[in-house]
Curated annotation (Swiss-Prot):
The chain crosses the membrane at residues 188-208. This is Protein SOP4. Involved in the export of PMA1, possibly through the monitoring or assisting of PMA1 folding and acquisition of competence to enter vesicles. GO terms for cellular component: endoplasmic reticulum membrane. Its main location: endoplasmic reticulum. The keyword Lipoprotein does not apply. InterPro entries: Sop4 (IPR031395). It is found in: Endoplasmic reticulum membrane. Residues 209-230 are cytoplasmic. One of its GO terms (biological process) is protein transport.
Amino acid sequence: MKLLILCLLYYTQLVICNVVSFTGKYSLHPKNLTIDDISRVDFRIYQIGNYTNKPFSQSTKVNSIDGLFTFNNLPLNRGNNVTTDFVIYSTSLDYNLKPVRILLTYTSWDDEANNHTVKAYSNFVGREYFPDKDIIFPDKLEELSMDPYLEVTYFNKAPYRLYYQERNEGILSTGIIGNILSSRWKTAGVITMILLIIFPYVVERLDPETSQLLREEVQRKQREKYQIQQ
């Protein structure tokens, strides 16, 4: 009985829908993609709007260092001038991507959905779905080029994702002090100068007799030097 129900559902899906594939491209131009780059980016697609059964969803990754990624078996509604809408989300662990959300509209031009066209639009926060056709002045979304592929790349003004951002920089990270501490050689030089300055005072505190002998030795050498010059 369960097998019969599954067969009927599958047959119903075939009658109502046709399936297609969609291919896009992930690019970090002018940088070439590496294995590490493509392993840290993901793409997801969700069917929205007009669907009969459970909305279609799928996740995919970049196939190779060419940057191509593919969604397979996207169901299209059959009928003349019938649309099927999807939304694509792109996420990366390293980069701020654009467009983050992509809206796809497939339009079928025959009863079998064999003749169809597809358009892509850049999406924004708060505009995750296509505007209702009954709205007189719907929001206009920017149409994206798909020649030869729909391209997803990084945001030029802020390419890298900042997981931690220091709001107020302290005195130790800016100015002269920050410049010194940013270089280990400058830091070592400053520490050496400080030690040379405070060393006599430390010795005098810890061992007054040794400090007195050191001062007498310095004075003796100065007197000998003065006598030699005369």
